[in-house]
Swiss-Prot record:
Subcellular location: Cell membrane; Cell junction, Gap junction
Stretches with biased composition (Basic and acidic residues): 147-156
All ranges on the Cytoplasmic side of the membrane: 1-22, 96-175, 249-396
Similarity remark: Belongs to the connexin family. Gamma-type subfamily.
The species this protein was found in: Canis lupus familiaris (Dog)
Name of this chain's protein: Gap junction gamma-1 protein
Comp. bias intervals (Low complexity): 373-396
An MF annotation (GO) of this entry: gap junction channel activity
Region of interest (Disordered), ranges: 145-165, 355-396
């Protein structure tokens, strides 16, 4: 009998079962299949040919053997192995189909992406470089990364070790796994009870038969009864061991699920504020504790800037003097003098702006002349203000 096909199928179950399930599979292959294929056939190959009865009545010996063994021991154990392994094989087919479907869906999602790149944020330049260049660079900038490189990095990371129970739960196979485990347990109990009613716990050396067409009670003799009794007890022990492993696996799944739920609740109590807000894609920002300061652009010291400052100061002083003059009723002549001086200062300021806009000779004679004129105008205006109303004002 060739067991290679069933053995290959059961090896695939090893990849989708728990730690206890792997032990059960080892017992099934090493004891049941190996013992039945090697020891059972060699022990029971002559059970009917060596079954001898002390009668010459035709057909009596066959009828007595049928009464002694309604079903051959080897055929009974082969049928038991097939039925017990059937739920596991069905679970294997369902698991392979579902996992392949999940992998195909993930592959379609990856292929549907428009760009095979992954984006992550990286610091652009150091603070010292930005200060030297007097430029404000972005603190974080996106760096493109190939998906293949990202997958290689994920594959190189060590995966958490587990006994298969978490993998079954993550793949959504827990319900079907429990169902096949229950079916396997029911078959074990059924065959254990059937084996007891068919064969008992001992193979007797002789069997008394009184069936027709036997004329009277006759004695039939069995070959190697002690060896067959030992082998029968071994098969009882293997069946009981497999049944205990099934019960152990059910307890393992139940207590493991309870322990995982308690651990998850404990982690939620320890971290109450974790992940209480929805994830939003925010704009790039600096990491915590990262501060950057950019030096402001320094205003160049030029004569044009001095002229602008002088114009603003003179305008403020004139407004202040007009306010005081309105209350004290200053002479109209003083106002006319001030207006003429303001006009002269404004003309000189326009000349300075024109000279600066050309930028051919920023320190040329025109700027110097404008500078001297602005100083003379400011001195005259200050003198006139002193003679006008006696109020002190600062002129630039």
């Amino acid at each position: 009998m060739s067991w290679s096909f069933l053995t290959r199928l059961l090896e695939e179950i090893h990849n989708h079962s728990t730690f206890v399930g792997k032990i059960w599979l080892t017992v099934l292959i090493a004891f049941r299949i190996a013992l039945t294929a090697v020891g059972g056939e060699s022990i029971y190959y002559d059970e009917q040919s060596k079954f001898v009865c002390n009668t010459e009545q035709p057909g009596c010996e066959n009828v007595c053997y049928d009464a002694f063994a309604p079903l051959s021991h080897v055929r009974f154990w082969v049928f038991q192995i097939i039925l017990v392994a059937t739920p596991s094989v069905m679970y294997l087919g369902y698991a392979i189909h579902k996992i392949a479907k999940m992998e195909h869906g993930e592959a379609d999602k990856k292929a549907a992406r428009s760009k095979p790149y992954a984006m992550r944020w990286k610091q652009h330049r150091a603070l010292e470089e930005t200060e030297e260049d007097h430029e404000e660079d972005p603190m974080m900038y996106p760096e493109m990364e190939l998906e293949s490189e990202k997958e290689n990095k994920e594959q190189n990371q060590p995966k958490p070790k587990h006994d298969g129970r978490r993998r079954i739960r993550e793949d959504g196979l827990m319900k079907i796994y429990v169902l096949q485990l229950l079916a396997r347990t029911v078959f074990e109990v059924g065959f254990l009870i059937g084996q007891y009613f068919l064969y008992g716990f001992q193979v007797h050396p002789f069997y008394v038969c009184s069936r027709l067409p036997c004329p009277h009670k006759i004695d039939c003799f069995i070959s190697r009864p002690t060896e067959k009794t030992i082998f029968l007890l071994i098969m009882y022990g293997v069946t009981g061991l497999c049944l205990l492993l099934n019960i152990w696996e059910m307890l393992h799944l139940g207590f493991g699920t309870i322990r995982d739920s308690l651990n998850s609740k404990r982690r939620e109590l320890e971290d109450p504020g974790a992940y209480n807000y929805p994830f939003t894609w925010n704009t790039p920002s600096a990491p915590p504790g990262y501060n950057i300061a950019v030096k402001p652009d320094q205003i160049q010291y030029t004569e044009l800037s001095n002229a602008k400052i002088a114009y603003k100061q003179n305008k403020a002083n004139i407004a202040q003097e007009q306010q005081y003059g309105s209350h004290e009723e200053n002479l109209p002549a003083d106002l006319e003098t001030l207006q003429r001086e303001i006009k002269m200062v404004q003309e000189r300021l326009d000349l300075a702006i024109q000279a600066y806009s050309h930028q051919n000779n920023p320190h040329g004679p025109r700027e110097k002349k404008a500078k001297v004129g602005s100083k003379a105008g400011s001195n005259k205006s200050s003198a006139s203000s002193k003679s006008g109303d006696g109020k002190n004002s600062v002129w630039i």
